[in-house]
């Protein structure tokens, strides 16, 4: 267990003529005092070399944590499904969501939101049955934060490791029914469906190459205590430990 460590977070955006901003990139790491500088350099490089555009605003936050604040959990098990078309991939994702209890109505809302939004900074929380949005945060959404791997050498590439760490934290809340995600990066067409029972199911292609729409949807239960759930997602530090299966 780390006695003292630091949450190191990055957010990058590009200003537009209307006074708003386009989300470019984000990043989350947890490390020791001696790891702060190399992690900051890594996150800056990610922000400055991104396919979504040239960031003219980059924010780095370094926050001290104590070891007793950190929760440890094993990663979700990974499976991969390759489909021949976006239509078939969507059908497969919907089938999985149905199997874990997400209604067709909520699925319709989720797929519409992910296909039509190109500037979501955080996740959208949807009621798993009604499809009603619960977080009321607009494009900001809910940012899952303070997450990393205990061991950096766990296999797979950086993109999959980051997404799996996030999905693992989300799935370990009793209020999460399932997560649906695909990236807003234009070159990346793979997404996933996940929860604590089915694990992390990668599905491709969930969108066409060159498309910048995407984001994350968390389907939540009737029993959700919204303030507690959001606090867990945004504030409680988590380290993922164990080998990928």
Swiss-Prot record:
Example GO BP: biotin biosynthetic process
Key words of the record: ATP-binding, Biotin biosynthesis, Ligase, Magnesium, Nucleotide-binding
pH-related activity note: Optimum pH is between 8.5 and 9.0.
InterPro entries linked: BioW (IPR005499)
Cofactor(s) needed by this chain: Mg(2+)
Pathway the protein acts in: Metabolic intermediate metabolism; pimeloyl-CoA biosynthesis; pimeloyl-CoA from pimelate: step 1/1
Function noted in UniProt: Catalyzes the transformation of pimelate into pimeloyl-CoA with concomitant hydrolysis of ATP to AMP.
Family named by the database record: Belongs to the BioW family.
Subunit details: Homodimer.
Protein name: 6-carboxyhexanoate--CoA ligase
Species for this entry: Lysinibacillus sphaericus
């Amino acid at each position: 267990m780390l006695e003292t460590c630091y949450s190191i977070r990055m957010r990058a955006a590009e200003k537009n003529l209307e006074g708003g901003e386009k989300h470019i990139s984000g990043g989350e790491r947890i490390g020791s005092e001696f790891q702060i500088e190399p992690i900051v350099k890594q996150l800056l490089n990610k922000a400055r070399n991104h396919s979504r555009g040239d960031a003219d605003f980059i924010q780095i936050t370094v926050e001290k944590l104590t070891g007793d604040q950190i929760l440890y959990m094993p990663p979700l098990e990974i499976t991969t499904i390759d489909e021949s078309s976006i239509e078939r991939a969507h059908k497969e994702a919907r089938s999985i969501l149905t199997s874990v209890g997400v209604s067709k109505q909520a699925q319709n809302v989720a797929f519409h939101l992910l296909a039509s939004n190109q500037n979501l900074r955080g996740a959208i929380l949807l009621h798993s049955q009604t499809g009603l949005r619960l977080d009321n945060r607009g494009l900001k959404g809910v940012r899952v934060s303070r997450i990393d791997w205990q061991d950096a050498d766990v296999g797979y590439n950086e993109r999959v490791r980051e997404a799996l760490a996030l999905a693992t934290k989300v799935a370990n809340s009793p209020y999460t029914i399932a997560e649906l995600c695909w990236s807003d990066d234009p070159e990346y067409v793979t997404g996933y469906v996940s929860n604590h029972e089915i694990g992390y199911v990668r599905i491709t292609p969930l969108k066409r190459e060159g498309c910048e729409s995407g984001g994350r949807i968390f389907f939540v239960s009737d029993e959700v205590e919204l303030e507690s759930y959001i606090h867990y997602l945004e504030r409680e530090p988590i380290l993922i430990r164990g080998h990928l299966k």
